């Protein structure tokens, strides 16, 4: 079966996976061994650490393999990082609807993202294998991203209640549950019965939302590169920083009113790039500049709007 060329050697794959496991072990076993409310300053520090590690890794790829793989990693990381911001909007709604205390939100996100890492790996390798065998799928992915981008723009102001969704209704019918919390536990025992707590319901919704967002983000990175190592590492670095980014931005998501417009434009651009990939070759630096420009413009426009908009304590989002 045909395969795509990759800069990743067995040693690099093993080293990167070992690094991810070590960082996750430090996160849960040392820094978050005891449940606590993650404050903005702590989240900012972790976010800066994850971004710095990603940039150092990208610089290493550039130095070792040349500017093209380096730019592909940075572009893929930027795409995944920007699309994951939309995930934060959903996480805020989930935690608010299920009334998950801030004390336990990190635990839910940790286990949700841990399972997301395994799921992303499966989806990435499946996608690479399918594209290697069926090149025409690149056009299908491109069309899907264009449609998704247009849909995101048209539904940018729509708010869904996760408690009324099909997944939550199915979970409550099939999994015995209780509305009561039992500390940080996903299950508890009431009257001799083992029941799921709201933390498990939140975890299921977090995992489901990540599956939906992965359907957008993974095809989008294939527009940048089909190198499995670059696709995997850029995706995983972005996911590892998602929890800290959530705690940093959760209280300010409503200020980014034009961000979904920027994300929809990115999806349409990336989808178009995939659709014309066999006819127009776009250099990695052009893709990176366009994506960064679209996101930057949407963020600046959002900040200008929020600065001139009246605010009140009553309007502040509750997490």
Curated annotation (Swiss-Prot):
Q: Where in the cell is it found?
A: Cell membrane
Topology term for the membrane: Multi-pass membrane protein
Specify where it is mainly localized: membrane
- Give the matching Pfam families: TerC
Question: What is the native source organism of this protein?
Answer: Myxococcus xanthus
NCBIfam families given for it? Answer: R_switched_Alx
Q: Which GO terms describe its cellular component?
A: plasma membrane
Q: Which stretches are transmembrane? A: 11-31, 43-63, 83-103, 108-128, 134-154, 195-215, 220-240, 260-280, 284-304
Query: What keyword terms does UniProt attach to this protein?
Result: Cell membrane, Membrane, Transmembrane, Transmembrane helix
What InterPro entries does this protein's entry cite? Integral_membrane_TerC, Integral_membrane_TerC_rswitch
Q: What is this protein called?
A: Uncharacterized membrane protein STKORF319
User: Has UniProt tagged this entry with the keyword ATP-binding?
Assistant: no
Q: Which family does it belong to?
A: Belongs to the TerC family.
